[in-house]
Amino acid sequence: MKRVALLVQYDGSHYSGWQKQKNATTVQEILDRALLKITNHTVQTFAAGRTDAGVHASGQVVHCDVDCVVPGNSYSDVLNSLLPSSIRILESIEVKDSWHACYSALYRHYRYVINNSKFPNLFIDNWSWHRYQKVLDEVLMLNASRQMIGEHDFFAFQKTGSNRTNSITKIKNIDIKRVEDLIFVDIKATGFLYGMVRLIIGQLVLVGENKISPEIFTDRWVNKKKNDVKESAPAKGLCFVNAVYEENVFKKINNNDFFPVFIIKGFS
């Protein structure tokens, strides 16, 4: 038996999230099915982050224990021959039995993309939220978000249905940048609550549109005013960029930010 780490990309548009569910197609289900074909035994996969329905991943990290003669670094090629084109394995490698995709991660990185153009763009529609009621003030959004850095109770930014015992987590960094009509919101945290990023984005957009002030934004999450946090950004604009570990287990790829380059270039 050996433990194999997988670096996984997927377009979440037609999946009901990462985790297996009854009567729904998920990324984990499809991946486990492919692993069964290779190993001839049931394989349990563990991911660094459990993305919700419609959310993408450009550098999801997964591990599994397999009893098979296939070398660890060959699983990427073999799996890609079995998986649909919406799921790709960028790299695979054998790791120590003590290494865990979820529990060994120092933090996770999510990115949200807002298309703030007056006009929709068909070619990035599946990976961004077209929101234009006015030009967003990304500087105001960034300033409002800065107070969230650190360990706090983010109860206001947790959707109903979470099984967590508490809503405390630590945000390491938040960055908001505009590239022409596209706004990129990058959030790095030790862990994320259910629906957390999309609820944060929904509120920050209201700040950027001057519909609520930065002070109201802060008051809502600091004082746990969950009933005032009603707007959730669409899933399609959210992407799990990567998970960061004490040691980068993937040897071929040093830079784990695999976000689509064509989006970063914006419109010409």
Curated annotation (Swiss-Prot):
EC main group: isomerase
Binding positions for substrate per the UniProt entry: 110
Record key words, sorted: Isomerase, tRNA processing
Family listed: Belongs to the tRNA pseudouridine synthase TruA family.
Classification via HAMAP family: TruA
Function: Formation of pseudouridine at positions 38, 39 and 40 in the anticodon stem and loop of transfer RNAs.
NCBIfam families in the record: hisT_truA
PANTHER family for the chain: PSEUDOURIDYLATE SYNTHASE (PTHR11142), TRNA PSEUDOURIDINE SYNTHASE-LIKE 1 (PTHR11142:SF0)
Quaternary context: Homodimer.
Name of the featured protein: tRNA pseudouridine synthase A
Organism encoding this protein: Prochlorococcus marinus (strain MIT 9301)
Lineage, broadest ranks: Bacteria, Bacillati, Cyanobacteriota, Cyanophyceae, Synechococcales
Gene name of the record: truA
